[in-house]
Design a protein with these regions (language model features):
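N-terminal pre-domain/capping segments
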Residues: 1-84, 90
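Active-site acidic/histidine proton-transfer and metal-coordination neighborhood
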Residues: 71-126
Length: 126
């Protein structure tokens, strides 16, 4: 069961993870502004959930983030949020982060998006 993770989107996921030996996906920061506004409130709850397992992944923010956007300023905002979540993961000792690329077939041509996704135009380095 070492490859299964339960998402904390379900408020009881940590208890089920403990019962069945699963890992936990910390999903509290899927909404980007929680990194800024609600961290102090969320942090102790996350730490409590982390007592129920020894394996974790942190879900990066994804709402309204487009790391492969056409607009370089939009890409810069996404990169900043990812840098934030990398620091948060380090603070929790989490080494795996789930990141969504923001692909929307109604906005991007697949060939253009794939090229952008794999290019050096998206950087998370500070």
């Amino acid at each position: 069961m070492d490859k299964f993770y339960l998402s904390t989107i379900d408020e009881n996921a940590h208890l089920l993870a403990k019962k069945h030996g699963f890992g936990i996906e910390i999903a509290e920061f899927c909404t980007p502004w929680f990194l800024d506004t609600d961290f102090a409130e969320i942090d102790p709850k996350i730490r409590e959930k982390m007592t129920c397992s020894d394996r974790f992944v942190l879900h990066a923010p994804f709402s309204e983030l487009f790391p492969c956007a056409i607009d370089p300023k939009v890409r810069a905002i996404a990169a900043e949020r990812y840098r934030q979540v990398i620091r948060v993961a380090e603070g929790y000792g989490i080494r795996k982060i789930v990141v969504h690329g923001g692909y929307n077939p109604r906005i991007y041509f697949p060939i253009w998006y794939t090229g952008r996704q794999t290019s050096q135009n998206v950087s998370f380095e500070e």
